[in-house]
């Protein structure tokens, strides 16, 4: 059903949306795992509480002191996110534990609250703030806990991976070895003896005994070989089988026969069977194998089932080895985990957890693995991979650090002498410093990509293979980097970086999430006997045995969702079967389920080559947020969901009216509550882009829960928007768009279409040293009066426009102390050198930066009595106090007026002093009581709100105020920090990189005058010219479909834009326009007679303001719909128009494809890249200039550039480039002398790289010389 009154986008494809609550939150991977790490519930698999409870209770060696854990407490961060970023601090929560210490000798029982350390706190966006910088812990692939059988270099191996403890590896070569952590080797017999096994137990496990009755004078003998083959009963208790079935089989005996004795492990033949028959023995014990296994290794183990050590050494080493094994498999040190235990039981077909038999079962399984060539376990399968997300990684690190804390506690307990020793029983720096170092140095802790909202979400959903499974970049082959069938709908096959990390850094699929067991799961519709029942999340362990069909296999009817046809191609693992709909188990949800968040924003994805889709998803993350961006005309339907999940816009938390609204805050009032929302204004990100929010509501508007009340510069109407819709033509224009070059119209610059704001932060630090204090002075700025008006106390004012090399902070550094003569002092005073003990070291604006000062943060730390005290800036503390106090008194006065109205309406008199808002005691309000039960009930509601909400917040504020000063983390020598932010506006320029959503990237080669751009017969100019040769070879045909569809829709929109005054148009014409549009797009005839004129006007305004469509990926999109729209409007079939040259006015011979395309400006700007080199460093070996801006390198003349010069025949220019301008040392020196003397002559010699080549040839024993 189409909602005619309210819609964001017209939908071309019919898509079944499931309920919003089932859609996984895109940041759930980070936020959910971190919350479970902090969870106080013991059920959480890796919470702090579970880690701590493993080590308690603690008992000292002499059993005199006993420590018991009572509870833990985690307090909220004392600083705000904004404050920590300004002050370059850490955002963290404080962790306390409550313990009871029992000292038995002294009858002491002490209950203590102990500070354990600081735990880094996560923001709403899923990142951490470390040293004032947004950082993120990306997830990591690792091998799942359990048992694996595999072959490596033609060796059969078995490995056991526990959660805690050493990895056990069974290797079968000439000897049967067991390896611990790939270091310590044991033979299997030593391993089994140390675990407590003996011969009898070992053979009772692998063999079993049966009684066999021997009947003399018969041609048959009765044995039990295999219960499944050739058996029949003669007597009640015996099973018969012919002698042929036991020839060559292994058995042993327990009873000795008369005269002849049978040795163990004899092979029976017919003669020996006859020997048995000749003796009068009726019952005989035989040992048979339980199952068929490799007997050679079993006999080897049996024969060598003694330690191969001398008897003298055995007394010393045996006890050591046994103790080693006991400690190795101690419960607290060796733990399989719940997942590992399940995998082992399932693989070995065990029902009970019997520690005595588990290793014997493993040996039996290994022998089967060798004998029958059982299939190897695949480590690339997601069933065998765990995801270590940020909560799990922090839990592992916290466990490692807390072991050190326990060692410290044990040391204190064992050296306990006085009661005061218990005060310092825990060293809190172990956890605080350990976690801080982990975030600063670990390769999984990365600088958050905040280029735009999409980049931030994608970075949150990244998964790394590096170092997780022991993988290094250099040694990774194609098998590790390649996609696997288990990745389907769980890991995106497209989204991965280009270069040496390809395939090693992956991204979660759009509808996948990490479950509580740390496996990737995705959402499916459940089908049982052809009926679609509901929705569930399943990981690869469960869905590998199911038949799964495509999302297009169902259709909606009035009776619900049903299958389209009786038979389908169903997928099971990596095979496809033709199955009836009754046998289908699971159905996919939608086409975006396969791909990642970035790839889901590419329209017509199925029409593009996979390599270009990869580039498209990577390019979108590099797009710069513009000042005024646009929503794409053609979208995929996911723009709104990604925009809402990015937290870049603000949603209302309650139903109510807007009480106040401006560009800095929005206040919403409800019947019982008032909430204030503060907007982010010109906030700097890690990539120097901005986040700027602006209000979408006005005073008096009614909002509901979930309504968008504030948008940002990267989102529009809630949808993510990163670029602009431009009118494009695929044609050649005087050779300027050669290869991937892009031509732009100057009208784009005039309209400021691709303008972006970048914020640069500059910091200067004032320190105290032996010579004195570093100071800030106005003298660095010079004596110009205009400049002095811009400066205040040595620092430039907010709002001033600055250029490169301008001084913004006048920093002065003290000189070494020395005595000046009276004449020197007089000389400096006369020439007004007041600061003659200092020299200047000002902070200046770097090259290529000019902009406006938008913020100056000055943090002072005062000096007193030769000691430096870290004090907070008084104004900053006042600011925070003021905000919280204002909120407290606003809400308090609101409820106070409610109480006054209640008392006044019910004519209840009370003294004015009790409820005077200027001088009020809160306790007086709590004392107010009424005899009327109804009034008293309402009063109690207001009292509870005041006590629970307001007083709690007041207490939290007091706690924060106390802890503000405690956690400043500066060096001892720092006395002042000054941070200045400059906002720089950057226009599009020649050399900037631009891209579409289909991987069609290029560099702006020229910006053409508006008058010279091609135009159509109506005089409409082209904004963008692309090379048509860039489409067929790249196979990204999706951009053409976008151009045709967006071009036809924009033409419809142009009809509406011409109607400026809606009062002049009749309602009949409005209805006619709406009917035509719905007929074109939806192919439906709508009856507008059921709507009144006001509703028709509302629909008409919606279409006029926004006529955007969405085409869902991988759906059966009918291209004929686009053709129908084009025909209805009256354009050529392929959107081909006749264009005219803007310079000559002549028309082009051929028709040109013209339409609209969504284009973005990428964060590869020419201003940041181009620089000049006059002098610089040279390479030691080749003596050529170094490369790169950071090395002050030169421009490299590569092989293709040489070809270009050769093609033009520029021999002398080429000679210069390859000799004196490169690595001809003698030629360089001579040219420098000639330039000084004014001689226009350049003689080149032999380049140094040629000398290197000569030495390399000579090293190969070739006698070669330069003639």
Swiss-Prot record:
Source taxon at top rank: Bacteria
One Gene Ontology term from the biological process aspect of the record: DNA-templated transcription
PROSITE patterns in alphabetical order: RNA_POL_BETA
Protein name: DNA-directed RNA polymerase subunit beta
Phylogenetic placement of the source organism: Bacteria, Pseudomonadati, Pseudomonadota, Gammaproteobacteria, Oceanospirillales
UniProt cross-references to InterPro entries, sorted A to Z: DNA-dir_RNA_pol_su2 (IPR015712), DNA-dir_RNAP_su2_dom (IPR007120), DNA-dir_RNAP_su2_hyb_sf (IPR037033), RNA_pol_bsu_bac (IPR010243), RNA_pol_bsu_CS (IPR007121), RNA_pol_bsu_protrusion (IPR007644), RNA_pol_Rpb2_3 (IPR007645), RNA_pol_Rpb2_7 (IPR007641)
GO CC field: DNA-directed RNA polymerase complex
This enzyme's EC code(s): 2.7.7.6
Function summary: DNA-dependent RNA polymerase catalyzes the transcription of DNA into RNA using the four ribonucleoside triphosphates as substrates.
Gene Ontology terms for molecular function: DNA binding; DNA-directed RNA polymerase activity; ribonucleoside binding
Pfam families: RNA_pol_Rpb2_1, RNA_pol_Rpb2_3, RNA_pol_Rpb2_6, RNA_pol_Rpb2_7
Catalytic activity: RNA(n) + a ribonucleoside 5'-triphosphate = RNA(n+1) + diphosphate
Family recorded in the similarity comment: Belongs to the RNA polymerase beta chain family.
Entry keyword set: DNA-directed RNA polymerase, Nucleotidyltransferase, Transcription, Transferase
Oligomeric and partner information: The RNAP catalytic core consists of 2 alpha, 1 beta, 1 beta' and 1 omega subunit. When a sigma factor is associated with the core the holoenzyme is formed, which can initiate transcription.
């Amino acid at each position: 059903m189409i909602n005619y009154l309210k819609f964001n986008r017209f939908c071309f494809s019919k898509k079944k949306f499931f309920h919003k609550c089932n859609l996984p939150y895109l940041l759930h991977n980070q936020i959910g795992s971190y919350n479970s790490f902090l969870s106080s519930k013991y059920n959480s698999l890796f919470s702090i509480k579970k880690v701590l409870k493993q080590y308690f209770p603690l008992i000292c060696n002499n059993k005199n002191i006993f420590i018991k854990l009572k509870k833990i407490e985690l307090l909220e961060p004392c600083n705000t996110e904004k404050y920590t970023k300004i002050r370059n601090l850490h955002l963290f929560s404080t962790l306390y534990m409550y313990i009871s210490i029992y000292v038995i000798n002294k009858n002491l029982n002490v209950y203590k609250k102990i500070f354990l350390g600081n735990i880094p706190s996560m923001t709403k966006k899923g990142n951490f703030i470390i040293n004032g910088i947004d950082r993120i812990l990306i997830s990591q692939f690792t091998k799942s806990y359990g048992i694996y059988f595999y072959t490596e270099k033609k060796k059969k191996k078995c490995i056991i991976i526990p959660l805690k403890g050493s990895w056990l590896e069974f290797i079968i070569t000439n000897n049967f070895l067991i390896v611990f952590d790939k270091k310590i080797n044991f033979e299997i017999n030593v391993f089994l003896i140390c675990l407590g096994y003996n011969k009898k137990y070992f053979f009772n496990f692998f063999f079993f005994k049966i009684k066999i009755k021997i009947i003399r004078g018969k041609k048959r003998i009765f044995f039990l070989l295999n219960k499944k083959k050739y058996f029949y009963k003669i007597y009640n208790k015996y099973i018969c089988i012919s002698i042929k079935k036991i020839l060559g089989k292994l058995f042993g005996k327990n009873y000795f026969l008369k005269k002849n004795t049978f040795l163990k492990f004899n092979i029976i033949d017919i003669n020996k069977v006859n020997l048995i028959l000749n003796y009068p023995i009726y019952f005989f014990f035989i040992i048979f194998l339980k199952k068929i296994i490799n007997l050679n290794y079993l006999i080897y183990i049996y024969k060598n089932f003694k330690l191969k050590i001398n008897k003298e050494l055995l007394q010393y080493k045996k006890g050591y080895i046994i103790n080693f094994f006991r400690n190795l498999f101690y419960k607290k040190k060796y733990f399989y985990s719940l997942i590992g235990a399940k995998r082992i039981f399932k693989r070995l077909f065990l029902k009970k957890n019997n520690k005595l038999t588990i290793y014997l079962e493993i040996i039996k399984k290994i022998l089967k693995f060798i004998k029958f060539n059982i299939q190897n376990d695949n480590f690339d399968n997601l069933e065998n991979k765990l995801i270590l997300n940020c909560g799990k990684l922090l839990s592992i690190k916290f466990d490692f650090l807390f072991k050190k804390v326990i060692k410290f506690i044990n040391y204190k307990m064992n050296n306990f002498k006085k009661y005061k020793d218990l005060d310092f029983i825990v060293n809190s720096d172990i956890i605080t410093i350990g976690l801080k170092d982990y975030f600063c140095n670990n390769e999984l802790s990365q600088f958050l990509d905040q280029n735009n909202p999409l980049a931030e979400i994608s970075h949150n959903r990244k998964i790394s293979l590096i170092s997780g499974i022991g993988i290094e970049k250099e040694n990774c082959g194609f098998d590790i980097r390649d996609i696997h069938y288990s990745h389907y709908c769980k890991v995106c096959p497209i989204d991965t970086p280009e270069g040496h990390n390809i395939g090693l850094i992956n991204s979660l699929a759009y509808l996948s999430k990490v479950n509580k067991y740390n496996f990737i799961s995705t959402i499916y519709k459940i089908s049982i006997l052809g009926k679609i029942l509901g929705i569930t999340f399943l990981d690869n362990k469960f869905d590998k045995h199911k038949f799964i069909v495509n999302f297009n296999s169902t259709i909606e009817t009035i009776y619900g969702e049903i299958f389209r046809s009786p038979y389908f191609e169903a997928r099971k693992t990596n095979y496809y079967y033709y199955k009836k709909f009754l046998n289908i188990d699971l159905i996919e949800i939608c086409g975006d389920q396969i791909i990642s968040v970035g790839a889901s924003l590419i329209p017509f994805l199925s029409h593009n080559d996979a390599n270009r889709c990869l580039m498209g998803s990577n390019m979108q993350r590099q797009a710069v947020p513009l000042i005024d961006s646009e929503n794409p005309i053609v979208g995929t339907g996911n723009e709104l969901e990604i925009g809402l999940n990015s937290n870049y816009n603000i949603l209302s938390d309650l139903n109510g009216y807007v009480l106040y609204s401006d560009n800095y805050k929005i206040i919403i009032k409800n019947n019982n509550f008032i909430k204030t929302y503060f907007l982010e204004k010109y906030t700097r990100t890690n990539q120097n882009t901005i986040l700027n929010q602006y209000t979408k509501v006005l005073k008096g508007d009614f909002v509901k829960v979930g309504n968008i009340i504030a948008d940002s510069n990267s989102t529009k109407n809630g949808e993510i928007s990163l670029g602009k819709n431009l009118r494009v033509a695929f044609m050649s224009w005087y050779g300027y768009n050669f290869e991937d070059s892009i031509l732009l119209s100057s009208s784009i610059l005039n309209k400021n279409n691709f303008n972006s704001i970048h914020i640069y932060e500059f910091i200067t630090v004032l320190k105290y040293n032996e010579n004195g204090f570093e100071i800030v002075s106005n003298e660095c700025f010079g004596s110009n009066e205009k400049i002095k008006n811009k400066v205040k106390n040595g620092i430039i004012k907010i709002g001033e426009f600055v250029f490169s090399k301008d001084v913004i902070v006048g920093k002065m550094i003290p000189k070494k102390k020395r005595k000046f003569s009276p004449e020197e002092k007089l000389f400096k005073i006369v020439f007004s050198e007041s600061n003659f003990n200092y020299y200047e070291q000002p902070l200046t604006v770097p090259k290529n930066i000019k902009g406006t000062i938008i913020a100056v943060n000055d943090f002072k730390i005062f000096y007193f009595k030769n000691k430096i005290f870290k004090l907070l800036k008084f104004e900053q503390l006042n600011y925070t106090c003021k905000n919280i106090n204002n909120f407290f008194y606003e809400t308090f006065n609101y409820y106070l007026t409610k109480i006054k109205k209640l008392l006044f309406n019910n004519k209840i008199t009370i003294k004015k002093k009790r409820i005077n808002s200027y001088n009020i005691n809160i306790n007086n309000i709590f004392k107010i009581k009424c005899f009327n039960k109804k009034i008293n009930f309402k009063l109690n509601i207001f009292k509870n709100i005041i006590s629970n909400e307001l007083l709690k917040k007041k207490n939290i504020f007091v706690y924060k105020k106390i802890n503000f000063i405690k956690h400043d983390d500066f060096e001892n020598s720092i006395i002042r920090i000054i941070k200045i932010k400059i906002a720089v506006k950057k226009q599009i320029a020649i050399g900037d990189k631009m891209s579409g959503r289909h991987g069609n990237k290029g560099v702006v080669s020229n910006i053409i005058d508006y008058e010279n751009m091609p135009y159509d017969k109506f005089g409409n100019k082209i904004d963008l010219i692309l090379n048509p040769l860039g489409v067929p070879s790249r196979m990204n045909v999706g951009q053409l479909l976008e151009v045709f569809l967006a071009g036809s829709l924009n033409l419809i929109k142009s009809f509406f834009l011409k109607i400026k005054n809606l009062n002049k148009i009749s309602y009949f014409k409005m209805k006619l326009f709406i009917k035509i549009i719905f007929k074109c797009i939806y192919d439906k005839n709508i009856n507008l007679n059921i709507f009144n004129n006001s509703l028709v006007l509302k629909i008409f305004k919606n279409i006029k303001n926004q006529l955007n469509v969405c085409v869902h990926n991988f759906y059966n999109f009918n291209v004929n719909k686009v053709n129908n729209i084009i025909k209805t409007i009256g354009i050529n079939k392929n959107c081909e128009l006749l264009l005219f040259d803007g310079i000559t006015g002549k028309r082009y011979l051929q028709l040109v494809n013209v339409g609209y395309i969504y284009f973005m400006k990428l964060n590869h700007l020419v201003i940041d890249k181009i620089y000049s080199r006059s002098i610089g460093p040279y390479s030691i070996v080749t003596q050529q200039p170094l490369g790169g801006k950071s090395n002050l390198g030169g421009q490299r003349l590569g092989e293709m550039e040489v070809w270009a010069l050769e093609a033009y025949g520029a021999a002398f220019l080429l000679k210069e480039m390859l000799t004196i301008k490169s690595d001809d040392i003698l030629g360089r020196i001579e040219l420098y002398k000639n330039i000084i003397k004014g001689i226009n002559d350049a003689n080149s010699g032999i380049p140094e790289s040629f000398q290197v080549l000569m030495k390399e040839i000579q090293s190969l024993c070739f006698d070669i010389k330069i003639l």
